[in-house]
């Protein structure tokens, strides 16, 4: 791929790569631009007071000390103290440089890392939904229902991949069918509003299930999202089955909207643990039908492939790709990179 001309120097190797979630933190180290990353055991965030402590624990299992770090985290990156969503850690890059002996630290949004990953994702690490398997060499989009609903674009321009983070998970989600109109009054809202994330995430699955039960006039019997999906996939609970069917339908609607926003002719990718667990439901007709139901642009949506990312460490693979060849990506680093 032709490279962009960047005046900014690449981060020095070895580079620590980190994907920081609310529950788990995953680290690896990349020694140089040609070596495979060495992965460390998954770290539970609750077991460490600070991220620096967690990094020290990971590095205690390696003879290699990193000169720099690229970390992906949930939430916006602002200022010199960056609190994590759903975790008590606060990332302080200047302190990290001083305490861990690093020269350079770059912090980006977690879905930017997911967007970086889909730039070069191989066929073995994706499951295609629908009949279209290959898209154009063009912009892409990624969505991920998890703790929340992450959304990012990956714009292809000037011979490079440019990740575009945002808060697309908070777009409005409204009823369209008669059944939707009966269910919607029972959904929990935030300040009277129902966003996509209110339905399309782990707690959103619970929200939808409880609303369906209230609509049907029955007491909910399932508590956890995993229980709902398990009963739905096993076809042992009618309300759970409808919950999952509507979940993938609404995800298809939102994915289609995001595809239009980014003109994602290169494909739309669904990532995260939930999507992998409900893959059989996503491969049923409802997801693609909702994705394509975007008159007057139905023909356009029919031409756009959709995939579920099955790579177990997708974010780390995206960060590694950037670490090896930063000039191939148009990643904005202003206000997010700290040097000694």
Swiss-Prot record:
Its main location: cytoplasm. It holds the Pfam family Glucokinase. It catalyses: D-glucose + ATP = D-glucose 6-phosphate + ADP + H(+). GO terms for molecular function: ATP binding; D-glucose binding; glucokinase activity. GO terms for biological process: glycolytic process. The keyword Protein biosynthesis does not apply. GO terms for cellular component: cytosol. It comes from the Bacteria. This is Glucokinase. The gene is glk.
